[in-house]
């Protein structure tokens, strides 16, 4: 590898910004920039990013992505925010060749691992982004262009003073719903009950305004769906004795 190539994966580890929201969920400001302390980016992960980004990677841009041109078809696009090491995302892409998957992850070791697994499985219907999800939603995703949004085991930000950092806020749900086609879904999963209740409250608070409905027969959570692969974070939660809560809403 040339020195120029080596800098590509490394520059993705540069400072990123974290969004802050007001108590009613409106976007407020970027509260701080921080260097991601994500552990060592292995040489193999670095090589996967350097050598395969042109096939699997998408970069931030100031206009919406042209999904038919990117994927070469008009299949539904499913966006997953925070795919971790990417194993479950790759598995879903493999199991659903009639859908296109787009994953966002800011941790470069996870991005590198995801690309390696996608390459191993010969996945063609997957693209990944290493950038702040709020900016991607705002600038790169056209309205009514997504078939679904997946958010599995996001950071729960346990302390009450940090709850404003939680990604699931009213404005986030409103923005996501704008990006969904009619019949598109929102699927959240968490192993923290407090965050599960927070997610449910947020979804219920805006569902009439944005036109989404809960498919749960009990009006809250759904049983764990078989189509969602078991993630590393879910396994960790199970070992700690945590419950698992899934939410699934459909856009009218």
UniProtKB/Swiss-Prot annotation:
The keyword DNA repair does not apply. Its EC number is 2.1.1.33. Keywords: Methyltransferase, S-adenosyl-L-methionine, Transferase, tRNA processing. The active site is at residue 155. S-adenosyl-L-methionine binds at residues 80, 105, 132, 155. It comes from the Bacteria. Substrate binds at residues 159, 191, 231-234. The keyword Lipid metabolism does not apply. GO terms for molecular function: tRNA (guanine(46)-N7)-methyltransferase activity. SUPFAM superfamilies: S-adenosyl-L-methionine-dependent methyltransferases. It catalyses: guanosine(46) in tRNA + S-adenosyl-L-methionine = N(7)-methylguanosine(46) in tRNA + S-adenosyl-L-homocysteine. InterPro entries: SAM-dependent_MTases_sf, tRNA_(Gua-N-7)_MeTrfase_Trmb, tRNA_methyltr_TrmB_bact. Pathway: tRNA modification; N(7)-methylguanine-tRNA biosynthesis. PROSITE patterns: SAM_MT_TRMB (PS51625). GO terms for cellular component: tRNA methyltransferase complex. Belongs to the class I-like SAM-binding methyltransferase superfamily. TrmB family. Catalyzes the formation of N(7)-methylguanine at position 46 (m7G46) in tRNA. HAMAP family: tRNA_methyltr_TrmB. This is tRNA (guanine-N(7)-)-methyltransferase. The gene is trmB.
